[in-house]
């Protein structure tokens, strides 16, 4: 296919148009009085949302060059969402501000590489200062504050705080759709580990691409299963019970995997195979954790056990197992409470004895998985459209809360970004590097400016006043008052704010140094076929 190429100013201007289209669409959602965006879906009702990354992913522009600019901003939103789980709209606003100011200076003759160095230096300083002014999130009240700000609902904030209190900060919290109209919290005992199914043909729910096993047997082994004959006697016993099977093994390959998949597809029995979690001695310990949780036995040479001699009595049991491409969650294992408590006590002793930070972290993860359980937030709403929107907000709130627990929190509403301007502006530099620093200083004002404008206030006036008030005081766009942001519960996770700035600066700096853009040349539409003059003319002389 032929290519179309644009250079220098033409290339950057086209990409800026794409950046503006996407950012202008997303930024109307920022802040407590941000609006929603309606997204057309190919089937079903439209999606109404204020989630930045969801909106960004939907935008495709007809012009290839403009679309590349839009996709770069979408990448910023996606990357921020992957790292922190929230802050995608802030990241989009920051990207647009840096790109706009940067391109003005590049067009005026500034050196893009000098500007890039200035942007990187300013961003590094701003991130360091964000960490300096952040505070630790370790109370239920602080967790509820963060979740409430992210979701825009105090009820959701309290719900997530309750969930984290019950399963611990490292516990597993999932979000499901409720059959009723109320949103509620359900906590079930369970364990999750980061291993998914070995074949996508094992899924039972093609929409979610996950396998759900109700009341399954669980085979736990540190051996590799390559020969189906090794487990054939066991499979025949399970077949008589008409129950599904989860296989957790070192690996399942050779003839064994296709044989299991074929029987699954034919409906002979429902089976899912996953690799054992962890490595080396840690893998053995985690398999033992799973065995104790489910009331099973690890089939291992250490105990003199062979796969061909395994019986149903050696298998674990659970009320439900959910497996997707990345994770396996075991819910309500059938292990005895006494055995689980003894295992928890053993792990706690090991945590107290170890001198390695890495080992301590891994032991705490095992403890959380064994004792924490799984919290399920069941989202309810009157309509499907409202349900989808609320579910997205709760997911954002959960991600924001975890980010806050990890790196602390700062004043919300764009206040923290303005608070670090003093340190950034004080950096000593010359020429185009100094210009790059000034670009970031200007961009740091943009989120609060947009929040104010979305709430009906003059952004420039709010920014000027914010620069002259005490640290921690900020503008509450919900009611137009100047308050202590932390006391008012208006806080953002440091990780979210930091990730938004870093990702925005990274992509913007690359875009500013772009000198040529290559895109597919649109093919002309094929001409309509000419009609045969002898057709359709019957009866005429």
Curated annotation (Swiss-Prot):
GO molecular function annotations of the record: ATP binding; ATP-dependent protein folding chaperone; isomerase activity; unfolded protein binding
Annotated localization: Cytoplasm
Enzyme class (EC, first level): isomerase
Biological process per Gene Ontology, one example term: protein refolding
Reaction(s) catalysed by this chain's protein: ATP + H2O + a folded polypeptide = ADP + phosphate + an unfolded polypeptide
CC annotations in GO: cytoplasm
Keywords linked to the UniProt accession: ATP-binding, Chaperone, Cytoplasm, Isomerase, Nucleotide-binding
UniProt cross-references to SUPFAM superfamilies, sorted A to Z: GroEL apical domain-like (SSF52029), GroEL equatorial domain-like (SSF48592), GroEL-intermediate domain like (SSF54849)
Disulphide bond pairs: none
Membrane in keyword set: no
Keyword Isomerase: yes
Gene3D superfamilies found in the cross-reference section: GroEL, GroEL-like equatorial domain, TCP-1-like chaperonin intermediate domain
Binding annotation for ATP: 29-32, 86-90, 413, 476-478, 492
Chief localisation class: cytoplasm
EC number: 5.6.1.7
UniProt xrefs under NCBIfam families: GroEL, PRK00013.1, PRK12849.1, PRK12850.1, PRK12851.1
Function: Together with its co-chaperonin GroES, plays an essential role in assisting protein folding. The GroEL-GroES system forms a nano-cage that allows encapsulation of the non-native substrate proteins and provides a physical environment optimized to promote and accelerate protein folding.
Subunit structure: Forms a cylinder of 14 subunits composed of two heptameric rings stacked back-to-back. Interacts with the co-chaperonin GroES.
Family (UniProt): Belongs to the chaperonin (HSP60) family.
Name of the protein: Chaperonin GroEL
Phylogenetic placement of the source organism: Bacteria, Bacillati, Bacillota, Bacilli, Lactobacillales
Gene giving rise to this polypeptide: groEL
């Amino acid at each position: 296919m032929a290519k179309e190429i644009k250079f220098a100013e033409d290339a950057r201007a086209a990409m800026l148009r794409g950046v503006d289209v996407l950012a202008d669409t997303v930024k109307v959602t920022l802040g407590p009085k941000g609006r929603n965006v309606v997204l057309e879906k190919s089937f079903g009702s439209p999606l109404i949302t204020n989630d930045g990354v969801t909106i960004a992913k939907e935008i495709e522009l007809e012009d290839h060059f403009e679309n590349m600019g839009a996709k770069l901003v979408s990448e910023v939103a996606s990357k921020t969402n992957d790292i922190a789980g929230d802050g995608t709209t802030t990241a989009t606003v920051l990207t647009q501000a840096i790109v706009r100011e940067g391109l003005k200076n590049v067009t005026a003759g500034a050196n893009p590489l000098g500007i890039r160095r200035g942007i990187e230096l300013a961003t590094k300083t701003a991130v360091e200062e964000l960490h300096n002014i952040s505070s630790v999130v370790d109370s239920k009240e602080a967790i509820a504050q963060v979740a409430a700000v992210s979701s825009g609902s105090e009820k959701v904030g309290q719900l997530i705080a309750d969930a984290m209190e019950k399963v611990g900060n490292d516990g597993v919290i999932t979000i499901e759709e409720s059959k009723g109209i109320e949103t509620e919290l359900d906590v079930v005992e369970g364990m999750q580990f980061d291993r998914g199914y070995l074949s996508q043909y094992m899924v039972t729910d093609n929409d979610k691409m996950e396998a759900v096993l109700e009341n399954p047997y669980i085979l736990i082994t540190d051996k590799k299963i390559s020969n189906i004959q090794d487990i054939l006697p066991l499979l025949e016993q399970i077949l008589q019970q008409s129950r599904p099977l989860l296989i957790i093994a070192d690996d399942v390959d050779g003839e064994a995997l296709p044989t299991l998949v074929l029987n699954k597809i034919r409906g002979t029995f429902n089976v899912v195979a996953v690799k054992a979690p962890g490595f080396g001695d840690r893998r053995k310990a985690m398999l033992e954790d799973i065995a104790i949780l489910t009331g099973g036995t690890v089939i291992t040479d250490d105990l003199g056990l062979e796969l061909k001699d395994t019986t149903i009595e050696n298998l674990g049991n659970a009320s439900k197992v959910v497996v997707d491409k990345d994770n396996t969650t075991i819910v309500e294992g059938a292990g005895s409470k006494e055995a689980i408590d003894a295992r928890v006590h053993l792990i706690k002793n090991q945590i107290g004895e170890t001198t390695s930070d890495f080992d301590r972290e891994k032991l705490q993860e095992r403890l959380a998985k064994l004792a924490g359980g799984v919290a399920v937030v069941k989202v309810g709403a009157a309509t499907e459209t409202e349900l989808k929107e609320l579910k997205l907000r709760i997911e954002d709130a959960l991600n924001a809360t975890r980010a806050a627990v990890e790196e602390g929190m700062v004043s919300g509403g764009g206040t923290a970004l303005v608070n670090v301007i003093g340190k950034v502006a004080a950096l000593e530099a010359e020429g185009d590097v100094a210009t790059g620093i000034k670009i970031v200083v200007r961009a740091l004002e943009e989120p609060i400016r947009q929040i104010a404008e979305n709430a009906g206030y003059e952004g420039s006036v709010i920014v000027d006043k914010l620069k002259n008030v005490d640290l921690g005081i900020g503008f509450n766009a919900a009611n137009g008052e100047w308050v202590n942001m932390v006391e008012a519960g208006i806080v953002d996770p440091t990780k979210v704010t930091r990730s938004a700035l870093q990702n925005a600066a990274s992509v913007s700096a690359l875009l500013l140094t772009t000198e040529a853009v290559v895109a597919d040349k649109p093919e002309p539409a094929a001409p309509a076929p000419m009609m045969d003059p002898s057709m359709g003319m019957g009866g005429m002389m």
